[in-house]
Amino acid sequence: MSDIDDHVKETLSEVRKVGANYEEHQQEVGLDIPVDLIHFKKFPVVDSPGKYMKVGHDTRSDISPDDSPELPDYSGPFNGSLRFSDFSKDALINMLEMSDEYYRVCIEGWAESVAERYGRDDMHRIQAEAWRDTILPQLRGMIDNWMELSDDEAEALISETQEEVEAQVEAGGVILVNPYKPKAEWKQYSKERLVKLALGSHEFLLAAIESWALVIVMRDGLDEMFAFQWTLWSEKLLPAAKDIKSRWMKISGDPVEAFMKDIQVDATSFPGKAFEMTFEMPEKEVGVFTFNKCVSVDQWEALGRPDIAEKASHTSCPAAIIETAKMYDPNMKVEILAIPPRVSKDEVCCKWRLSIRDESDPEYVRPGEGSAKT
């Protein structure tokens, strides 16, 4: 069981909410959280901390419907300055459907893994606690930020959501309620409203994932949660996530280009309160993506624990990115240009470069030989 004291638990609960004001939670002395900072895999980093400062902004949330190319999907060329408003309204509905399916796959994955580790009865208790303590208290704020509803409509949606949650709890299954699941009338909404709904669906998805993770932290500590996430994403969720994005957004292209487009429309990393990214392809088979803002880094730095930010980054991001890269091409090379700890908050949170190995590379994979070493 976790030996995190009550004060630390309360602070963690507040600072790990999506959109938390980190300045309010800034710790002069690092928060005392038990964690193993020695026994974890550190991936090689190309450059030293302090090299890459934040440049540019995340264009995906820019809304400019008047000059939209009305993309039906993302089967066309990579666009480093992609705006979600570049998609047609039908494509944005597909993006929302993609986000909903992504949400369901993630939550079912968490539920299955929790049941395997703790038993099905504990899984039901954990998901009920996650909804009661984390998701529902944040729901009104998410609705007000993204859904453009009146007070009466917002309260009606919250009541409807609570009723659905209670019904699914009573039925004994996994709670998959999603107020951002597209409805028939959404097809009549403006493009601006659909983009906001897509961004809101991302915030809801993050809150749901975080709610499960937080319960595990409170029960068994950070190390258990880090190990849990590593296994869950690398073994269970990544193939499904790649398939979901490919089907709904028609992602295509050469391997690096396709993976760059995959990342741009990944519902777990849409722009907003948690993430801000930039994307570029300086050469045909070279892609670079940068997190200028990352909720995990911001949280741990606010708590005075950049050392935990380092562990969190190494135990979650590389596994997901490297494994997905291999799905696109076993010879796709992933290089970490920057990763926590940072020298200052003006520095990027992390930076990654994708390329394709040639036959001179000692890790080149010949057809039929399997995967490259990581």
Model-found features: residue ranges?
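N-terminal accessory segment detector
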Residues: S2-V288, V295, Q299-S316, K326-C349, ...
